[in-house]
UniProtKB/Swiss-Prot annotation:
Enzyme class: lyase
Phylogenetic placement of the source organism: Bacteria, Pseudomonadati, Pseudomonadota, Betaproteobacteria, Neisseriales
EC number: 4.2.1.59
Protein's name according to its UniProt entry: 3-hydroxyacyl-[acyl-carrier-protein] dehydratase FabZ
Organism field: Neisseria meningitidis serogroup B (strain ATCC BAA-335 / MC58)
Gene Ontology molecular functions: (3R)-hydroxyacyl-[acyl-carrier-protein] dehydratase activity
The entry's keywords: Cytoplasm, Lipid A biosynthesis, Lipid biosynthesis, Lipid metabolism, Lyase
Record Pfam families: FabA
GO annotation, biological process: fatty acid biosynthetic process; lipid A biosynthetic process
UniProt entry tagged with the keyword Lipid biosynthesis: yes
PANTHER family assigned: 3-HYDROXYACYL-[ACYL-CARRIER-PROTEIN] DEHYDRATASE
Primary gene name: fabZ
GO cellular component, one term: cytoplasm
Compartments where located: Cytoplasm
Catalytic residues as annotated in Swiss-Prot or TrEMBL: H53
Amino acid sequence: MDVQLPIEAKDIQKLIPHRYPFLQLDRITAFEPMKTLTAIKNVTINEPQFQGHFPDLPVMPGVLIIEAMAQACGTLAILSEGGRKENEFFFFAGIDEARFKRQVIPGDQLVFEVELLTSRRGIGKFNAVAKVDGQVAVEAIIMCAKRVV
């Protein structure tokens, strides 16, 4: 698979199964097979989670930032394997050492930097960092597992 950067949202949907409102990646800006991937998400007030989290003080839920990081990790794995096979999915399989260091609010642009640490028998372990304006917002070790469905 020849990877042309940037990869826009419509093409990300060809790689991972997520769709609105759960697709959390807007663009892939960098990719090195079996090593790293950089993706972005533009956080906007019109996203459904902000209706209740919190109406007077909208803050992006940490679990959605973690989900976005996992989507970036899965995308790195899929691209590294040459693209998505029809019946294969990479599922979020685990998280360690998660740290939340900065709130993310509407108007922010999240930059996800993920690095493949190990890959064995269909399970990848990744170092994942989410940044806003160069500041770390969230960091974690994320595991994704490939499954045939």
